[in-house]
Swiss-Prot record:
MtmB1 transcript is abundant relative to the mtmB2 transcript. It comes from the Archaea. It comes from Methanosarcina barkeri. SUPFAM superfamilies: Monomethylamine methyltransferase MtmB. This is Monomethylamine methyltransferase MtmB1. It catalyses: Co(I)-[methylamine-specific corrinoid protein] + methylamine + H(+) = methyl-Co(III)-[methylamine-specific corrinoid protein] + NH4(+). Gene3D superfamilies: Monomethylamine methyltransferase MtmB. Changing A36S: In strain: NIH. It holds the Pfam family MtmB. GO terms for biological process: methanogenesis; methylation.
Length: 458
């Protein structure tokens, strides 16, 4: 039976009030893991250790499993404790009518985001920035300026303000509203000081409530040519605050960036099971959120990193499959274990850049060094490496990419527990001139040399 109209966030809200009742524990501990395991077995999914898939039949099975996961499970609303279900026709309608390209930024600083494919020769868009990492108020502008000064960086992804006027931006307080507005205003001023006043940004990152996110659209702040973030919850869940934010974004004609980081070793389970959920999450982004693009980020439950062997496989297979069977535009976000000014951090980011570029990602978003949890431990140098490696990887044969990745990951994967803490932005850069130290330049050159020895040609 055909659908009455295309599904949107208002339909989601209505169904979230009347859907099947379910406890969150049943959803997290029973429905998600059992269905993911069932679908892995049904379709015989086995990635055989590949980072980027070469078996198109297996990719098709993965797509069917992800589609079926979304169709049969639906999405859990954490506020009403009900399940929102979609029809098969509604899902296909969303897939068949995705936003196939869009522009981020304005003027000469604008960039066109267009579909890429597995092994594409075109370099992906580099969205450089702290990626939600906490940044001190006194260095908020220079930190973001360090990214805008990098020509490899096309757009900025915001950091989190730890304070505004010296006060904590507590959710649903006036300070959260002020921080949400100030965050992007400061970043756009930083871009202008770098000579790139039209750069697009992605945020807001500081605010945690709907009122904070909505207030970021303001004079001097977020505009419709910026990526506006809304986050799904782990796994296949959402709250009604997010649905209200989506309604605002749609009504404002904003570029919508739907974000979610599936957890390897979490509710979904292993590599193939988590990838099934990841594919379902991509599809849900364009259905529930009317997303312009989906920001992925498979993360390891133990190490808190997106750069492990397992999470890179999940990211590579999910993106390649989405790219092969849909026109959904996809990005990935970067959370290395190691901190800035360390070779390990740069090698971790490089492994993910290689994976994302080869698997067809449209946007690379990072780098949140030191797992994105330590204040001021993120700089523009990590984004430079992300961009240079993407440029070197574009067009390389997938078989060669898989060999390089296997060797590269083996260089750092035994060091997660003892990953070097690295240095803060203030220790990595001259804050006044916003230039990296000689020490960081030498570390960077050392990491680059190792990548060249593995076969990358810069």
């Amino acid at each position: 039976m055909t659908f009455r109209k295309s599904f949107d966030c208002y339909d989601f809200y209505d169904r979230a009030k009347v859907g099947e009742k379910c406890t969150q524990d049943d959803w997290d501990l029973m429905k998600i893991p059992m269905k993911a395991m069932e679908l892995k077995q049904k379709y015989g999914l086995d990635f055989k250790g590949e980072f980027i898939p070469t078996d198109k039949d297996m990719m098709e099975k993965l797509f069917k499993a992800g589609f079926e996961m979304l169709l049969e499970c639906g999405i859990y609303c954490t506020d009403t404790h009900r399940i929102v279900k979609y029809t098969e026709d509604e899902i296909w309608d969303a897939i068949n009518n995705v936003q196939k390209e869009f522009v981020l930024g304005t003027g000469r600083d604008a960039v066109n985001v267009r579909k890429r494919s597995v092994g594409d020769k075109a370099k992906p868009i580099v969205q450089g920035g702290p990626t939600g990492s906490p940044i001190s108020e006194d260095v908020f502008m220079p930190v973001h300026m360090s990214y805008a000064l990098e020509k490899e960086v096309d757009t900025i992804v915001n950091g989190v303000m730890t304070s505004v006027r010296g006060k904590s931006p507590i959710p649903k307080s006036p300070y959260e509203v002020l921080a949400a507005k100030t965050e992007t205003r400061l970043i756009k001023n930083a871009c202008a000081m770098a000579g790139r006043p039209g750069m697009g940004v992605o945020g807001p990152e500081t605010s945690l409530s709907a009122q904070g996110n909505i207030s970021a659209d303001c004079t001097g702040g977020m505009t419709c040519t910026d990526s506006h973030e809304v986050s799904q919850l782990n796994e296949l869940k959402i709250d009604l605050d997010a649905i209200s934010v989506i309604a605002h974004y749609k009504g404002n004609s904003d570029i919508i960036m739907d974000e979610q980081m599936p957890i390897f070793g979490g509710y979904a389970g292993g590599i193939e099971e988590t990838t099934i959920v990841d594919v379902a999450t991509h599809i849900n982004a364009v259905l529930m959120s009317s997303a312009s693009w989906h920001l992925d980020g498979p993360v390891h439950i133990r190490w808190g990193s997106t750069n492990t062997r397992e999470t890179l496989m999940i990211a590579g297979w999910a993106c390649a499959t989405i790219s092969e069977f849909t026109d959904i535009l996809s990005g990935n976000q970067y959370y290395p274990c190691a901190g800035p000014c360390t070779e390990m951090c740069l090698l971790e980011a490089s492994a993910q850049s290689i994976t994302d570029t080869a698997s067809g990602r449209e946007i690379l978003s990072g780098v949140a060094s030191a797992k994105g949890v330590v204040t001021d431990k993120t700089t523009g140098m990590e984004a430079r490496m992300m961009g240079e490696v993407a440029r070197a990887t574009a067009g390389v044969e997938i078989s060669e990419v898989n060999v390089i990745l296997d060797k590269l990951v083996s260089l750092y994967e035994k060091n997660y527990a003892s990953a070097p803490a690295g240095k803060t932005f203030q220790e990595c850069y001259d804050v006044k001139t916003v230039t990296p130290t000689e020490e960081y330049m030498q570390v960077y050159d050392g990491a680059r040399k190792k990548l060249e020895d593995l076969g990358l040609v810069f």
